[in-house]
Amino acid sequence: MESPSFSKPVQSATVIVGTQFGDEGKGKLVDYLSDKYDIVVRYQGGANAGHTICFDNKTIVLHLLPSGIFHEGCVCVIGNGVVIDPAALLDEIRKVEELGYEVKGRLFISHNAHLIMPYHKRLDSLHEDAQGDQKIGTTGRGIGPSYEDKFARKGIRVVDLLNPEVLQEKLRDNLAAKNKLLKTIYEKEEFDIDAMVKEYAEFDKIIDPYVTNTQLYLNRQLKAGKTVLLEGAQGCLLDVDHGTYPYVTSSNPTSGGACTGSGIAPNYIGKVIGICKAYMTRVGNGAFPSELSDETGERLGQIGHEFGATTGRKRRCGWIDLVALRYSLAVNGVTEIALTKLDVLDTFEEISVCTSYMLDGKEIQDFPTDHQTLSRVTPVFKTMKGWKATNADARTFDEMRPEARNYVTFLEEELQVPVTFISVGPGRDETVFR
């Protein structure tokens, strides 16, 4: 006979994932949920993504620190899957402290997280410039080259900052190779090895109070009954394995990446909340079937303030794409949807939804992840009546405009996943729960 406890799930962790091309509004949801969880974890990416948070008439953009840092009872963790620019991280810590928030004792950084070095950033920009028309659209923050070194087993990790001899040896080995590349391939100035060794040796005492084995810490906290919220950067369609390759990021923003990027055991994951905008955006290059290259697309961008939080680049805009969303929901095992920026659609007479694609004369429902095929599809749209009014004062679904409710209900029926969170404005309180 099976033991009564044999199949009992252990579910104390929730993952928040972007289901589109990033920039879905994860910062607002994580900010709202942070005071309901004991620990908030960032599990992948680096300073190439920005989470925008609006509160107390302030707009704050975080690139590395988890959004929970603004909730005093919340512990924040930067996991092993994140690549860290030490100078950028310390600058972000300083800015948060200047706002009156305590960081020491509330922030833990994985000793296994890899570092972004100055040569990563320079090589990132040089490689992108050399691509010409084939540019990926990198932010130039050194993310890709840092991950390259990680998987080539040449990377420098946070723990190396605490060991001067190891740091010096790794820096000299890396710079010998990088300087040769800079000089012979790109014909650029080499880095001063001694100067960089001296600069990075000074991070030792500054970063030491934050560094720990976060894999063990998180699993022990979960075993003790603590709750954990995991926040990813970017979105599923930019995942290096599951996204629109090669126009992707260098890590795994998907829910599976939450485990590998934090060290949390999979059986602790109870919920996966998928975030999507009420429309769609993409920054940089790559196929975008529902893109609007007309006045409507411009209007979406202007109303939605669609400029990258990290680079300031203008985002491409289009209608929501249910083909892409169905794929993202499946890959991530999404249990509920958080719909953001519904207010951007408040002034539109009509709103369209991409429900399928046409490919070589046939209608398809499955999302092609290879860029060559995706770039050949054309969207099939269903047009709905807009609500032409604000929902900012609504706090329940019934208080929303009928046409807005119809829009949300249609998305639910098509996606077969409940929409439980609806952002009707940028503020913390401008939210409808179901």
Swiss-Prot record:
GO terms for cellular component: cytoplasm. InterPro entries: Adenylosuccin_syn_GTP-bd (IPR018220), Adenylosuccin_syn_Lys_AS (IPR033128), Adenylosuccinate_synth_dom1 (IPR042109), Adenylosuccinate_synth_dom2 (IPR042110), Adenylosuccinate_synth_dom3 (IPR042111), Adenylosuccinate_synthetase (IPR001114), P-loop_NTPase (IPR027417). It is found in: Cytoplasm. It catalyses: IMP + L-aspartate + GTP = N(6)-(1,2-dicarboxyethyl)-AMP + GDP + phosphate + 2 H(+). Its cofactor is Mg(2+). The active site is at residues 23, 51. This is Adenylosuccinate synthetase. It comes from Chlorobium phaeobacteroides (strain DSM 266 / SMG 266 / 2430).
